[in-house]
């Protein structure tokens, strides 16, 4: 479970399956000063524009654009964290990120042995040319996460869970005992490229009203279909045995497994 220290980001040639290493996690790791890399993402499958996160030792977000590589740190007092889950705009030099306070538990009796959950999260937009950050959604008593653009770049989809944690006992403790009450639904906001503004939040799938939790929205290349993961609760469905993939026809708003 803790072998993340040996992670590498590789690329494979589809013509002959030759592999080469883009980045080796052990290059900057040493005993007691480990590094963790992941969340690599490209702009519309373009290898000339890539980003990945490096955490812990020498942490930051590595952005490679048009042959130039740089490390940035978006952590600021006004943000919950540095950027976490990324989503490149299809053709503009913009990356939507969630910022998250994340925890995890290990269970012995529950059939889902690992539980990863947030106690707070927002969605932001990072301008890679001007190094500026603007909020997209940071509502009180809501946790927004997993941004994803439509193929035309006119909509930003994301998940949001409405829940109010107790301040008297602390968010971490309350979330730890009520993690099965955290249920995400899928929203989207219209994006205006000319003035870089977002519209009001539009509810696309009210999973919470159906006692479910929907995460990781992805839009088909034609723009007509939404694929998402859905389970009984929470945001990290990779650990949930009951979770499955669903598809929604955005023209009829009907969903099916």
Positions of predicted regions on the chain:
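Multi-bladed beta-propeller domains
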Residues: 14-35, 64-82, 124-143, 189-213, ...
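Short, conserved, GDST-rich strand-edge loop motifs in beta-rich repeat architectures
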Residues: 1-3, 97-118, 159-182, 229-242
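Residue-level detector of Asp-centered blade-edge/turn motifs that repeat once per structural unit
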Residues: 44-46, 90-91, 151-152, 221-222
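Hydrophobic beta-strand positions that form the internal "hydrophobic ladder"
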Residues: 49-50, 95, 153-156, 226
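Loop/turn-rich, solvent-exposed surfaces of beta-rich toroidal or solenoidal domains
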Residues: 211-247
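Beta-rich catalytic cores
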Residues: 36-38, 82-84, 119, 143-145, ...
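Conserved beta-strand position repeated across blades of beta-propeller domains
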Residues: 41-43, 87, 148, 218
């Amino acid at each position: 479970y803790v072998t993340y220290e040996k992670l590498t980001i590789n690329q494979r040639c589809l013509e002959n399956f030759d592999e080469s290493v883009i980045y080796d996690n052990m290059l900057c790791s040493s005993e007691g000063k480990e590094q963790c890399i992941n969340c690599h993402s490209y702009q519309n499958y373009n290898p000339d524009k890539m980003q990945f996160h490096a955490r812990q030792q020498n942490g930051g977000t590595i952005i490679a654009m048009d042959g130039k590589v740089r490390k940035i740190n978006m952590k600021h007092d006004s943000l919950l964290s540095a950027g976490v889950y990324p989503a490149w705009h299809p053709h503009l030099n913009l990356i939507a990120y969630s910022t998250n306070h994340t925890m995890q538990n290990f269970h012995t009796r529950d059939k889902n042995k690992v539980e990863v959950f947030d106690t707070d999260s927002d969605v932001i937009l990072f301008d890679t040319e001007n190094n500026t950050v603007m909020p997209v959604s940071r509502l009180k008593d809501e946790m927004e996460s997993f941004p994803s653009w439509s193929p035309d770049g006119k909509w930003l989809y994301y998940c949001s869970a409405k829940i109010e944690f107790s301040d008297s006992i602390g968010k971490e403790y309350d979330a730890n005992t009520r993690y099965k009450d955290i249920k995400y639904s899928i929203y989207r906001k219209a994006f205006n490229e000319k003035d870089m503004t977002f519209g009001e939040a539009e509810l696309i799938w009210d999973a919470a009203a159906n006692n479910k939790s929907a995460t990781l929205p992805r839009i088909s290349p034609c723009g007509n279909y939404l694929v998402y993961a859905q389970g009984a609760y929470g945001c990290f469905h990779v650990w949930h045995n009951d979770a499955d993939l669903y598809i929604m026809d955005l023209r009829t708003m009907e969903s099916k497994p």
